[in-house]
């Protein structure tokens, strides 16, 4: 049972295995509780949630139509004494819209963890994303390119921060340090 001493409530669509390092670091260094969805339409390996100090609950992702889904028991979390809500920046999650609405009314801060703008959005997607992202207090996006595109769409640059991708950077450094130049590609393709 959550004691709500944490000031940050993280509600994500799922806890993927590749985000284990960043979630573990957040869990050990920040006052945050974690709530993860149970499944996606495309199966993906989940991390071991018990590794997190403040894993609170797995929420059921109920798919309604196409990619749109509702996260059961997520909306009630906005009425808990958290100060910040970190959500996937996914407009397909309909319960996130409701959380954003209530958070605004209750004067709570919301942060999107998202790819942001890709640059190939249709007019309909642009309108939906613009409305959705405008509901957040702040946006954490993966790249400067997304920030550039979103600022052209009217988003305030001061409310966006580039967090790069959430892959295991420390492990990638170790792997890259062991790599060496090879002719395997040019030899195989004769170029």
Give, region by region, the residue ranges found by the protein language model.
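An aromatic- and histidine-rich active-site surface loop
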Residues: 42, 84-106
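A short, histidine- and acid-enriched strand-loop-helix "catalytic/donor-clamping" loop
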Residues: 94, 106-127, 135-138, 142, ...
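Histidine-centered beta-alpha loop that forms part of the nucleotide-sugar donor binding/catalytic region
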Residues: 13, 37, 89-90, 113-117, ...
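Short, well-structured alpha-helical segments in soluble
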Residues: 72-81
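Helix N-cap/beta->alpha junction signal
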Residues: 15, 89, 143-145
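A short, charged, and often flexible helix/loop element on the N-terminal side
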Residues: 51-73, 87-89
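Donor nucleotide-sugar binding/catalytic pocket of nucleotide-sugar-dependent glycosyltransferases
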Residues: 134-191
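N-terminal subdomain of nucleotide-sugar transferases
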Residues: 1-59, 80
């Amino acid at each position: 049972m959550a004691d709500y001493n944490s000031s940050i409530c993280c509600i994500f669509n799922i806890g993927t295995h590749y985000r284990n390092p960043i979630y573990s670091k957040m869990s050990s260094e920040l006052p945050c509780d974690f709530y993860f969805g149970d499944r996606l339409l495309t199966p993906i390996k989940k991390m071991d949630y018990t590794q997190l100090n403040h894993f609170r609950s797995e929420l059921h992702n109920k798919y309604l139509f196409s990619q749109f889904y509702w996260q059961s028991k997520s909306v009630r979390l906005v009425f808990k004494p958290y100060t910040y809500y970190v959500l996937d920046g996914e407009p397909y999650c309909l319960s996130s819209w409701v959380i954003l609405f209530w958070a605004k009314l209750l004067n709570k801060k919301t942060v999107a963890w998202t790819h942001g703008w890709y640059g190939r959005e249709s007019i309909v997607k642009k309108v939906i994303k613009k409305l959705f992202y405008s509901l957040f207090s702040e946006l954490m996006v993966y790249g400067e390119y997304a920030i550039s595109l979103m600022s052209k769409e009217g988003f305030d640059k001061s409310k966006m921060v580039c967090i790069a991708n959430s892959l295991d950077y420390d492990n990638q450094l170790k792997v890259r340090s062991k790599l060496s130049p090879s002719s395997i590609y040019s030899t195989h393709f004769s170029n």
